C-alpha cells in the first residue's frame, strides 16, 4: 500500500463514518413530520420482515402528519403493529388502507433527551474517526519500518492524518450543533 492510497482510503472511511452519523440523525424526531422517521420500521409481510417502504408509500401532507398508504389491504394491521413496535411515540390512526400518523409536539424533556442522543451519536462517530486515525498511523509506521517512506516523510504524513481527523471531527461537531438547533426549535 502506498502513501497516496493510504490517505485516500482513510478519507473514504471517515466519509463513511460521517454518512452513518447523518443516517442516524435523520431518524431523530425533530417535531416536524419526516418519512425518515419510519426508516427503522419493519413489517411482518408474506412470512418475512420487510422495511415499511416496501409495503406502503410514505408522504408528509403537512408539517405535523405522516401518511402511510398501504398497498395491500391485508397488510394494514401488520403495518400498524410494526409502527407501534418501533416505539417512535406515534399513534396510528387508520382509515381504510391509509394510516395517518399525527406527530405530537415535542416536550422540553423529550427535546433534551433527543439532544443527548444526538451528542452520543456524535461521540460514537468521533470514536470511529479516532480508530480510523489509529489504523492509518499504524500503516504509516509499517511503511516507515519497511523503509518504503523516510522518517521525516512519516512525520509529515502523520501530521496530515491528524489534520484529516481534526477536519472530520469539526464536521461532526457542526452537524451535531445543527441537529441540536433543529431539535430545540419549537
Curated annotation (Swiss-Prot):
Its main location: cytoplasm. Gene3D superfamilies: 3.30.1360.40, Ribosome-recycling factor. The keyword Protein biosynthesis applies. The keyword DNA-binding does not apply. InterPro entries: Ribosome_recyc_fac (IPR002661), Ribosome_recyc_fac_dom (IPR023584), RRF_sf (IPR036191). One of its GO terms (cellular component) is cytosol. One of its GO terms (molecular function) is ribosomal large subunit binding. One of its GO terms (biological process) is cytoplasmic translational termination. Pfam families: RRF. Keywords: Cytoplasm, Protein biosynthesis. CDD domains: RRF. It comes from the Bacteria. Signal peptide: none annotated. It is found in: Cytoplasm. Belongs to the RRF family. Responsible for the release of ribosomes from messenger RNA at the termination of protein biosynthesis. May increase the efficiency of translation by recycling ribosomes from one round of translation to another. This is Ribosome-recycling factor. The gene is frr.
Amino acid at each position: 500500500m502506498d502513501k497516496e492510497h493510504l490517505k485516500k482510503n482513510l478519507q473514504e472511511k471517515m466519509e463513511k463514518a460521517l454518512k452513518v452519523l447523518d443516517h442516524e440523525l435523520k431518524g431523530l424526531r425533530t417535531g416536524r413530520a419526516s418519512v425518515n422517521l419510519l426508516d427503522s420500521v419493519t413489517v411482518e409481510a408474506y412470512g418475512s420482515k420487510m422495511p415499511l417502504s416496501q409495503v406502503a408509500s410514505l408522504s408528509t401532507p403537512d408539517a405535523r402528519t405522516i401518511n402511510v398508504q398501504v398497498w395491500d389491504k391485508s397488510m394494514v394491521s401488520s403495518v400498524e403493529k410494526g409502527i407501534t413496535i418501533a416505539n417512535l411515540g406515534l399513534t396510528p390512526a387508520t382509515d381504510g388502507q391509509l394510516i395517518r400518523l399525527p406527530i405530537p409536539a415535542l416536550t422540553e424533556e423529550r427535546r433534551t433527551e433527543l439532544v443527548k442522543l444526538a451528542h452520543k451519536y456524535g461521540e460514537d462517530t468521533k470514536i470511529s474517526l479516532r480508530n480510523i486515525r489509529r489504523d492509518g498511523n499504524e500503516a504509516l509506521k509499517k511503511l516507515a519500518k519497511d523503509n518504503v517512506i523516510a522518517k521525516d516523510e512519516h512525520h509529515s504524513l502523520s501530521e496530515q492524518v491528524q489534520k484529516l481527523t481534526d477536519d472530520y471531527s469539526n464536521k461532526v461537531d457542526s452537524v451535531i450543533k445543527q441537529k441540536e438547533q433543529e431539535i430545540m426549535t419549537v
